[in-house]
Every structure is written in structure tokens, then in C-alpha cells.
Amino acid sequence: MAKKTIKVTQTRSSIGRLPKHKATLRGLGLRRIGHTVELEDTAAVRGMVNRVNYMIKVEG
């Protein structure tokens, strides 16, 4: 069975954000507005998504 994945898209800029939030975006592999990455749906990734949920959109 294939592992479940989620698509994460950055919708807002990281300029002026907390350093931890910028680092979280980098950890998710996001670099710029409109950038989309497909990530494995794990507890660690979900925690990162929850930290920066105001800057991203999640599908799947």
C-alpha cells in the first residue's frame, strides 16, 4: 500500500515572520509564494503544518 501524502502550498510571504516559522517553512521545503511540495503525511509534518498554518494551504 502506498504511503499517504499531502500537498502543501505557500500562500503568504515569510518576510517579517518569526525565525522559527521561517525555519519551519524551509523544513517543509517551501521557498516562495505559490511553491507546492508533496510530503508524507506523518505526525512530524502535521506538527510543522500546524505551526505555520496561516501561511500555507494543505490539500489531501
UniProtKB/Swiss-Prot annotation:
Similarity comment: Belongs to the universal ribosomal protein uL30 family.
InterPro entries: Ribo_uL30_ferredoxin-like_sf, Ribosomal_uL30_bac-type, Ribosomal_uL30_CS, Ribosomal_uL30_ferredoxin-like
Gene source species: Idiomarina loihiensis (strain ATCC BAA-735 / DSM 15497 / L2-TR)
Subunit structure: Part of the 50S ribosomal subunit.
GO-annotated biological processes: translation
Taxon lineage: Bacteria, Pseudomonadati, Pseudomonadota, Gammaproteobacteria, Alteromonadales
Pfam family, one: Ribosomal_L30
GO cellular component: a single term: cytosolic large ribosomal subunit
NCBIfam families noted in UniProt: rpmD_bact
Encoding gene, per UniProt annotation: rpmD
Keywords: Ribonucleoprotein, Ribosomal protein
Record-level Gene Ontology MF annotations: structural constituent of ribosome
Protein name listed in UniProt: Large ribosomal subunit protein uL30
Keyword Membrane listed: no
Gene3D superfamilies to which the protein is assigned, alphabetical: Ribosomal protein L30, ferredoxin-like fold domain (3.30.1390.20)
Origin: domain of life: Bacteria
Keyword Ribonucleoprotein found: yes
HAMAP family reported for this sequence: Ribosomal_uL30_B (MF_01371_B)
